[in-house]
Amino acid sequence: MPISALHGDMVVSRGDNLGWSAAWKINLYGRLGDGESAYRILRGLETEISIHPQRDDSDRVPSMEGNQGIQAFTAGIAEMLVQSHASEIELLPALPKEWPTGSARGLRARGGFTIDVVWKNGSLSSATVQAKYAGECRLRCAVPVRVLHGNREVQGRRVDANVTEFATEANAVYSITPQP
């Protein structure tokens, strides 16, 4: 059984309660690529526990140990949109169907990268990758992508159908679009 399946079983067996661990479960489901489960908990926190302005609308009081809960909550959203592990940046790894269109700016990835991402109809529309350092960027996306630096197409290497690797220059910005 793959390690992700074991972790997924552990998260599922503990349930989707909205107590102090809920914000961390958003992160765990996001890391496992399960955007629907992450969204279900996120939505529960928003509607069933009063993190919204009208505290009187809920009979449940939030239990998010100070800033820790809010940090985990926002980190979970970021985890649903961009992940960077094993020298790879993955765009929209756990996008729930409830977010068919949207954007995020300034998401950080390992290796000194800053990511902006836009999606429409549940799929990548465009992204930018800003490299702080010169080196390699390995990008994973559900659709094959094209990489531009300014108006010039960057010659990358297709590692597999969903992974493109390309060289970066320090402080350069790269535009990412789905291949036509």
What is the role of each PLM region?
Residues M1-S84, E88, S125:
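Active-site core of glycosidic bond-cleaving carbohydrate-active enzymes
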Residues N67-D116, K120:
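Catalytic cores of secreted or luminal carbohydrate-active enzymes
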Residues T101, G111, S123, Y133, ...:
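Residues that act as N-cap/strand-start positions at coil-to-secondary-structure junctions
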Residues I115-V117, L124-A131:
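Short, well-ordered beta-strand segments enriched in hydrophobic/aromatic residues
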Residues V118, Q155-R158:
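Short, exposed beta-strand/loop patches in secreted or surface proteins that constitute
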Residues T128-P144:
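Surface-exposed beta-strand/loop patches in extracellular or lumenal glycoproteins
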Residues R157-P180:
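C-terminal beta-strand-rich structural cap/linker in extracellular carbohydrate-active enzymes
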